[in-house]
Amino acid sequence: MPNRTVPTLEELLTLNKVQQTLRLTEVNQHLESLTAQERVVWGLENLQGNHALSSSFGIQAAVMLHLLTSVKSDIPVVLTDTGYLFPETYQFIDELTERLNLNLKVYSAPVSAAWQEARYGKLWEQGVEGIERYNQINKVEPMRRALDELNIGTWFSGLRREQSQSRASLPILSVQNGVFKFLPVIDWTNKEVHYYLKDNDLPYHPLWEQGYLSVGDTHTTQKWQPGMNEEQTRFFGLKRECGLHEDHNDTHQ
């Protein structure tokens, strides 16, 4: 990258979101010209702090897990376990952890799933507000804790623009919740994902064969039906994001 250094987190955190975006424009323009593999190498070499990859071990999770561990084999892989994942997901986690020798770090809410139900009822049945509270407790807070405890400065994720409208304009590099957020496959299509998995002999999530396009918790994931898009298969179509990939100024339950 011609005579340009990446701004420090300290500098970027003094700016508002618009200023951060502008400050990172030239960096992102450069990153758009690189392959995903080149972006990973660039990110590991140029972005400060400890690095980590978050994974939900969803339908296409093997792509990012393979892409990152091929370059940095011991990178921490953070999973936020709600206690309500599909049995097939837990089996998929075990399979990929063994196969790729993952440095898996599992984080969960301080209160168990059963205790939460006793205390709050089934939050996912309580409309958008209930779903957001559920996600805050089971996904956002555990991920925040992981970033803090592992002292993460750069967070890698496998989000892709094609997945939803809320992700359609995301840049490769941004700042989220005080750390660098880096999305190496943000511009990949489903076709590119398919061929990467095929070329590297990597599996889709087991539920892919049963018609699932996206997999999260058992109670908020639907199998794809004709006429549905991917966004409508999660959270009863009420929302797409679980909150994990959104900026939060504060954390509360």
UniProtKB/Swiss-Prot annotation:
EC number, as in UniProt: 1.8.4.8
Protein's pathway: Sulfur metabolism; hydrogen sulfide biosynthesis; sulfite from sulfate: step 3/3
Transmembrane segments: none
UniProt main location, coarse: cytoplasm
GO biological processes: hydrogen sulfide biosynthetic process; sulfate assimilation, phosphoadenylyl sulfate reduction by phosphoadenylyl-sulfate reductase (thioredoxin)
The keyword Cytoplasm is assigned to this record: yes
Entry's Gene Ontology molecular function annotations: phosphoadenylyl-sulfate reductase (thioredoxin) activity
Subcellular location: Cytoplasm
EC class of the enzyme, as a word: oxidoreductase
Annotated GO CC locations: cytoplasm
Keywords: Cytoplasm, Oxidoreductase
Active-site residues, Swiss-Prot/TrEMBL: C242 (nucleophile)
SUPFAM superfamilies found in the cross-reference section: Adenine nucleotide alpha hydrolases-like (SSF52402)
Reactions catalysed, as given in the entry: [thioredoxin]-disulfide + sulfite + adenosine 3',5'-bisphosphate + 2 H(+) = [thioredoxin]-dithiol + 3'-phosphoadenylyl sulfate
InterPro entries in the cross-refs: PAPS/APS_Rdtase (IPR004511), PAPS_reduct_dom (IPR002500), PAPS_reductase_CysH (IPR011800), Rossmann-like_a/b/a_fold (IPR014729)
CDD domains: PAPS_reductase
HAMAP family in UniProt: CysH
Biological role: Catalyzes the formation of sulfite from phosphoadenosine 5'-phosphosulfate (PAPS) using thioredoxin as an electron donor.
Family: Belongs to the PAPS reductase family. CysH subfamily.
Full protein name: Phosphoadenosine 5'-phosphosulfate reductase
Organism of derivation: Vibrio cholerae serotype O1 (strain ATCC 39315 / El Tor Inaba N16961)
Gene giving rise to this polypeptide: cysH
